[in-house]
Amino acid sequence: MTRKIAIYGKGGIGKSTTQQNTAAAMAHFYDKKVFIHGCDPKADSTRLILGGMPQKTLMDMLRDEGEEKITTENIVRVGYEDIRCVESGGPEPGVGCAGRGVITAIDLMEKNGAYTEDLDFVFFDVLGDVVCGGFAMPIRDGKAQEVYIVASGEMMAVYAANNICKGLVKYANQSGVRLGGIICNSRMVDLEREFIEEFAASIGTQMIHFMPRDNIVQKAEFNKQTVIEFDDTCNQAKEYGELARKIIENEMFVIPTPLKMDDLEAMVVKYGMTD
């Protein structure tokens, strides 16, 4: 059965990079069949998998050619290790609602049977925080059963993670979605691991993996590749492989208990963090 996973996190936290490298590790090290559906108007959720090739977004095709032209063959691109990719895209700047675009895109993909039964994983890479109903769609309407939140030891990243949990709680009973854990994408902040471990435990989940910071991630990106494709023997590739393994084997799925603001701020003060 295909596992459908939504990846959330504060804008700029490294969510798309983490998601693409994890998907690449699943396909390369564990022979998993993976589909990535980018739900960000920037349309950068699949760039590394596709070797930097710009992908025509579903919303662009919808505007330019009409719904009848949207087929799996026309819109889905295949990249590294046969990972299938689609980007929702968004409206023209200053016009329309990008969240509405996410809803339209996922509905069209389902209508066209893009999420085939042979897939092991479908990833929805979702813009920033749960800022509106459209971006909450993967968890609101049960499109994804699992959520992983990318965070770091910076206050605003944890604040965003806590807000995402509030959105998840709102929809958990109607959609069945559950939190699988927090991925700490390290910013090399003092006591970062301890902070995220305590935060995760306090909301009833786990820090599923601590991803160390390594410049090879940037080197791979400059070469328009994931770390896995760039050098699958390096330490960072092994870290992404370990995160992939933990997600594959994960059995801890919870409805989180978000912290009240006073409790979150007290935890931040305890670790001496300011953003």
UniProtKB/Swiss-Prot annotation:
Entry's cofactor comment: Binds 1 [4Fe-4S] cluster per dimer.
Annotated family: Belongs to the NifH/BchL/ChlL family.
Positions carrying ADP-ribosylarginine: R100
Protein name: Nitrogenase iron protein 3
Catalytically driven reaction(s): N2 + 8 reduced [2Fe-2S]-[ferredoxin] + 16 ATP + 16 H2O = H2 + 8 oxidized [2Fe-2S]-[ferredoxin] + 2 NH4(+) + 16 ADP + 16 phosphate + 6 H(+)
A GO BP annotation: nitrogen fixation
Entry cofactors: [4Fe-4S] cluster
Transmembrane segments: none
InterPro entries: NifH/chlL_CS, NifH/frxC, Nitrogenase_Fe_NifH, P-loop_NTPase
Subunit details: Homodimer.
Entry function: The key enzymatic reactions in nitrogen fixation are catalyzed by the nitrogenase complex, which has 2 components: the iron protein and the molybdenum-iron protein.
An example molecular function term from Gene Ontology annotations: metal ion binding
Organism: Clostridium pasteurianum
One family name in Pfam for this protein: Fer4_NifH
CDD domains linked to this entry: NifH
This protein's record includes keyword Membrane: no
Mod. after translation: The reversible ADP-ribosylation of Arg-100 inactivates the nitrogenase reductase and regulates nitrogenase activity.
Record keywords, A-Z: 4Fe-4S, ADP-ribosylation, ATP-binding, Iron, Iron-sulfur, Metal-binding, Nitrogen fixation, Nucleotide-binding, Oxidoreductase
Binding, ATP: G9, K10, G11, G12, I13, G14, K15, S16
